[in-house]
Amino acid sequence: MSRTTETNNTRPKLPVGKILTRTIKMLWEFYPVLLPIALLGAVIQAIMQSLPSVFLERILSIISNFIDSGDWSSAEGLVFQNVALLATFYVIGLLANIISTQGMAIVTQGALQKWRSKMFSHMQDLPIRYFDTHLNGDIMSYYTNDIDAMRQMIGTSLPNLLFTSVVIIAVVFIMFYYSALMAMVVLFGFSLMGLATKNLGGKSAKNFVKTQKTTADVEGHIQEMMNGEKVVKVFSHEAETIESFDKINDELMVVARNANLYANTLMPILNNLGNIMYVVVAVVSGVFITLNIQNVSLSGLPFTIAVAVPFLNMTRQFSAQINQISSQINSVVMGIAGANRVFELLDEPAETEEGYVTLVNAETIDGKVQEAEYRTGYWAWKYPHSDGTVTYTPVKGDVRLFDVDFGYEPGHTVLHDISLYAKPGQKVAFVGATGAGKTTITNLLNRFYDIEDGKIRYDGININKIRKSALRRALGIVLQDVNLFTGTVLDNIRYGRLDATDEDCVKAAKLAGADDFIRRLPEGYHTMLKDNGSALSQGQRQLISIARAAVADPPVMILDEATSSIDTRTEAIVQRGMDALMYDRTTFVIAHRLSTVRNADVIVVLDHGRIIERGTHDELLAKRGTYYQLYTGAFELE
């Protein structure tokens, strides 16, 4: 029920700077016009929001001058002029905000859609080894938790941080413009807020990253338990299952609690420090004005009440922006962690393709095999040579293994010196206990894994020279664990060959013995299947799987324990379908029920990755060796 997992910790994490750079670079590639417009809108909005303090100082100065001179007529025009300018800037800021928020919404959702497409497309190019070593729940987490974390970062946090940074820069410049001494007082006070943010925010961020990883672990565990729920109930392991889930669930609770504990502690501290700074600035401003301390500024203006009031306003503004940065840190950290995992998936090495021999439709003209532009039902290997010539070799289904060694992990060989020969049309059966290497051999035939030593030839061609897509089209497979997709019965059969007509699919279903039960379904071949065809019996699902393989009409078939999980009566029905499928084509069969392989042309007995016996059923019984012991029940396959 469990599978070997290869966690992301086995791959080095990218530096934070590189992750952010790569994220922004990809956003720019996706939206080279809209992204800069949206970001420019955020910058303009920030600048517009920083200007009120300047206009407030001007208006207060004008009113102060009016009080001194008593000439309201000239002051009135200046006040309304500044108010009008301020209102204009507010309108510009509002429009910039609309452009920024709407633009970033489009960029964010569009980028996530493109990332999901890239991830899914790349996932189709990954080798089977990747899926054999990663939990389904962990893979699903890429598309849910990690993408959602990126959404928060790109759509909200990064624009807010850009906006906040511009506001802080503008406010600091304005502060120094009016009073360098007061600006340094403010910056010193807010440096304390920076220290609090660094310490508490850093601890909070680390725990948020752990929360994200542990959430993926919980999802993977739930997925695994859902897939194995029947096994849990068969062995009455409900209590142990609950205990194992509680352990990982408790871990999630602890890291999530710590993350929120630090985050919830940080914000009150920052708010109170901001309030304290406001009081400090007010007191220091009063001292400056009362003692008439000489002001040092870029403007050359004295430090008056007209400067003190906007300075207090800027202090509030500065404090609010520091709080805003602190509140976005966790979102950015989680977004970076999510982006790191997404990029790890995108950076996973794709399945290599060094083959150049392809599979083509063929026809014979004047005794020569030539490529056909239409489906002929006759296949040939197209073998291009270095001199520009092309050789067409008819596909016969001649499969040979020469001294093959293989191991899933370096230094751990599971197949030793495997040599066998399947003539065209022969039925070769693999027999042996679990772990003997039966399924591993079939994984090598279709190059889900590559051999370490030896050779495998298909119609005399080294399979390393055949393109994997062509090789797999020439190999049909019926697995014990049937996978049916959401769609009609017809769609699921057609999955074997996407250009198959409805008539081709019905013909394949009849060959597999599935036509009768399909026509009894509510909508026949157009009946919708969902949840892996859960409304069908195991035998019916298996028959559809056989029909899917039949419509592909490959010259070589692999039947991997295709009847081991169904009852004897259903097996007889399925067996008839498989017999029809195997007729006149090379077939490799793996079965736990030896009765299904009695009529095999060659039976290969495997033990710990080695061939220990081979021959026909009668020949092996006469030897009274391992096969004899298995057949008579002295040995068990499982």
How does the language model describe each region?
Residues 1-49, 64-85, 100-104, 108, ...:
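Membrane-integrated ABC transporters
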Residues 9-16, 40, 48-64, 88-136, ...:
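Juxtamembrane helix-loop junctions of ABC transporter transmembrane domains
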Residues 25, 29-32, 128-129, 147-154, ...:
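An intracellular "coupling" helix at the cytosolic face of ABC transporter transmembrane type-1 domains
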Residues 30, 34-44, 159-210, 283-303, ...:
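Transmembrane helices of ABC transporter permease
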Residues 33-96, 176-181, 283, 290-302:
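Transmembrane helix-loop-helix hairpins at lipid-water interfaces of multipass membrane proteins
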Residues 65-67, 174-188, 262-340, 345-349, ...:
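Helix-loop-helix
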Residues 72, 362-638:
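ABC-type nucleotide-binding domain
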Residues 96, 100, 108, 144-189, ...:
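Hydrophobic alpha-helical transmembrane segments of ABC transporter permease domains
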